[in-house]
Each structure stands twice: as structure tokens, then as C-alpha cells.
Amino acid sequence: MGMSVNSDPAALVPEITLLVSAVTGLLAGAWTPRERQGTIHVLAALATVVGLVATALAARQPDETVFGTYVLDTATHTTRAIVLVAVLALIALSRDTVAGHKRETEFVVLLQLGALGSIALAGAGDLIMLFAAFLLASVPFYALAGWAKQGRATEAALKYYLAGALAGVTTAAGVTILFGVAGATDYEKVADGISRGPAAAAAVGLIAVLAGLAFKAGAVPAHFWVPDIAEGTPPPVAAALTTVPKIGALVAFYRLLDTAIPAAAIDWRLITAVLATAGMTLGNLAAFAQTSALRMLGYSTVSQVGYLLMAVAVAGRTPLAQPALLLYLAAYALTNIAGFAVVATTHEHRIDRYRGLFHRDPLLALALTVALLGLVGTPPTAVFVGKLEIFTAAMDGGLAWLVVIAALNTLASLFYYLRWITPAFRPAEDDSAAVTPPSRWARAVALTTAALTLLLGIGSGIVLNALGASG
């Protein structure tokens, strides 16, 4: 890949730390009394902090590959940071939900293993590594989806697993076909092989692999599990499953197409642009009629993936594409977690039940407003800057028609987000109605992530410079 090859496992400190923490937590949890299993949360939180420090140090080093299959570059380092921050927020968000639960340890362990798979997806520079990372980012999250063992959660988990099983088989078939066409698994060698091999067979293999990555990202047409998971599982689980795997999957999407698939052999730009259009449009249309806050957030994540795929569609055509994708992913992770954290705080799943929220808890109502207007892309939130950068990259990459569609979808999305925001600032119809006490940890996460999305938006220029954006 034109990079030096590093055979020192020390280059993988963030990944190793997550793995060791997960295994240690699993073993310790089996012997720790239920009332003391909060120590597993502390261990996991410390592991994420160590991983973030190691990531910051590693980001100063030149780009390289580890064992020739795992790429350490700006995209991988940024993915590490985003995923680890998301895991830290999710550990805190889950505290009120899982404390004292008989499967408390399992939640944290599965979250860490799934996060490890997401990071591995982003760094994969080899087809075999890509498939192994796909499995690691899948199996723990299947189990996490059914963690609560409630009726709706079990149904959602079963749908998620069955769709994932099909996606896994499809991905394996695609990897096999691409290997057969190219005669190699290293991305750069795959690109050379595809240039000389039968384009039709390579296209079939590529579509199969992209179908698997689309499932992990929750992109159309492999998005059907997203609203069911969002509504059927506890909010911390829903937040994890609609945030963490998407990050790695979209970076993997970008790296695979930009490095391994020659656009001259297969017109993957058009394929990706069509997926982006379908995602943002169908996600918005489905969200319009929702009365469930969680289901609305689920469809919202589908539309957000559509916008993110715009950057993938112009990969390699403009230097703005990768920084825009990475900034948007960071902004999306914070904003999406903030939305689910508000629901976890209030314990209210219906939009009309948020009436009077501002009078009961002004700060939480403001956090909800920041989260939802952030998902629209309203300044000064980070999603606004991320979306603006992606629109600019798409224009620079010659996809002006896609920018027009995205702008129209952005305006349309304001309608259903306002349907949730407006009741929060109206007086409650019945002040004497019983209100469930808010979850302390979830409220703290909602306020913190909402504040961070504003800070990231304000400081986005510094972040973009660090990510290598030009101009």
C-alpha cells in the first residue's frame, strides 16, 4: 500500500486494550457479586481512556500497515477516537439501566467486543481482514440486541440476527468472488487484479461485499432492522447498535472503494450515489409518520447514512471527501447518542409525552433541541459543518445533482424533528400527571454529548485541519 509494514503488536495498543478489558471483565464478572459489578464499568471506562491516549500518540506516527493487513492512518486513528468516545458515553448511559441486572457484565463486554470489531473494520486493508472484522462487529451486537430478554427486544434481536446471517453469507461470497477475480486479498493487489480480470464477475463480488457493509451501516436497502432495534431494545442498547457499527462500516466502505476497486472497471460511484439518495429519501419519508420517538430516531439514522455515503461516492475524486466523512461521523455519533440519552432520561417513548419538558427540566429540553436540530444540520452544531463539508466535497467531485437532493431532504427532515421539539416547549396539559424520575447518568450523558456537538461544531476548523482538509 506504499506504506511501511510494522510487525510490532504495540502498534495495536487501543485494540489490545479493548480486548483485554473485555476478557478481563468477562472473567471477573463471573466471580464478582452482583452489587459490586459496577467495577467492570470502571475497568471498561479506564480501558477506553487508555485507548484514547494511545490513539493520540499513534496519530503522530507516519502511516503504516500492521502485518500487511491492517492500516494505521488518519482514517483508522479517527475511527479509534470516535468509537472509544462513543463507548465511554454508552458505558455511562447504560449505568442506570444495567446496574444490578443479572447480565450487567455481559452488556459492557459485548459493547467492547463490538466496538473492537468496528475499529477493525475501519482499518482493514485486506479482504480476509475485512471479513474477520465484519464478524467481530456482528456477533457481539447480535447478543447485545437480545440482552434485555424482553418480548420486543427478543423479536428485534431475532430479526437483526437473521438479516445479519444473510449479510454475513453475502459478504463471504463477495470476498470469495473478488479473490477469485483478483488472485489476491491485499487491497492494492485486488485493484490490479480487477483491472485485468472480468469486470462483470468483479461487479458481482463487489455488490455482495457492499451489501454486507450496507447492513452494518444500516444503509438502504439493508436497513430494515434499524427501526425495530431502535424501538424494541432499551435506549442504551439502541444507541450502541445505531452508532458504533456504522462508524467502522462507513470507513470500511470508503477504504474498500477508494483503494481496492478501480472506478474505471466498475462504476461504484453511481452505485454509492444511488444508495445515498435512497437512504436519505426513504429514511426521511418513513420518519414523517412516526409517533414513537425511538422509531423516529431509528429512521433518522437511516437518512444520516445516506448523507454520509455522499462522501464515499466521491472518494478519490476530491481531497475533501475523507475529512468530511470523518468529521460527520464524529458529529453523528455524539448527536445520535444525545437523542437516545434524552429518551433514556425521561423514560418516555412517545413524542406527545414530551409536552412540558422545558418546564420540568429546561436543560434537558435544550439538550433535546440541540440533538434534533443537530441531526437536521443546524449551525453551530457539528453535523452542520460535517454536512456542509460533505456537500462541498460532492460538488467538488462532480455530483451536484446529489447535493440538490440532499439539500431538499435536509429541509424536509426539519418537519419531523420539529414535531418532537415543539411539544417540549409547550405547557403540560396535566401538571398533576405522574412523571417518572429522570435517570441521573442518562441525563448527564445527554447534556454532555449535546454540549460536545456544539463545541465540535465551533472548533470544527481545527478538527478539519488535523484531518487533512485542504482549503
From Swiss-Prot:
One of its GO terms (molecular function) is NADH:ubiquinone reductase (non-electrogenic) activity. It is found in: Cell membrane. It catalyses: a quinone + NADH + 5 H(+)(in) = a quinol + NAD(+) + 4 H(+)(out). Its EC number is 7.1.1.-. GO terms for cellular component: plasma membrane. It is a multi-pass membrane protein. It comes from the Bacteria. GO terms for biological process: ATP synthesis coupled electron transport. InterPro entries: NADH-Q_OxRdtase_suN/2, ND/Mrp_TM. Keywords: Cell membrane, Membrane, NAD, Quinone, Translocase, Transmembrane, Transmembrane helix, Transport. The chain crosses the membrane at residues 11-31, 39-59, 81-101, 105-125, 127-147, 162-182, 200-220, 234-254, 270-290, 296-316, 324-344, 365-385, 398-418, 444-464. Coiled coil: none annotated. Its main location: membrane. It holds the Pfam family Proton_antipo_M. NDH-1 is composed of 14 different subunits. Subunits NuoA, H, J, K, L, M, N constitute the membrane sector of the complex. HAMAP family: NDH1_NuoN_1. Belongs to the complex I subunit 2 family. NDH-1 shuttles electrons from NADH, via FMN and iron-sulfur (Fe-S) centers, to quinones in the respiratory chain. The immediate electron acceptor for the enzyme in this species is believed to be a menaquinone. Couples the redox reaction to proton translocation (for every two electrons transferred, four hydrogen ions are translocated across the cytoplasmic membrane), and thus conserves the redox energy in a proton gradient. This is NADH-quinone oxidoreductase subunit N 1. It comes from Streptomyces griseus subsp. griseus (strain JCM 4626 / CBS 651.72 / NBRC 13350 / KCC S-0626 / ISP 5235). The gene is nuoN1.
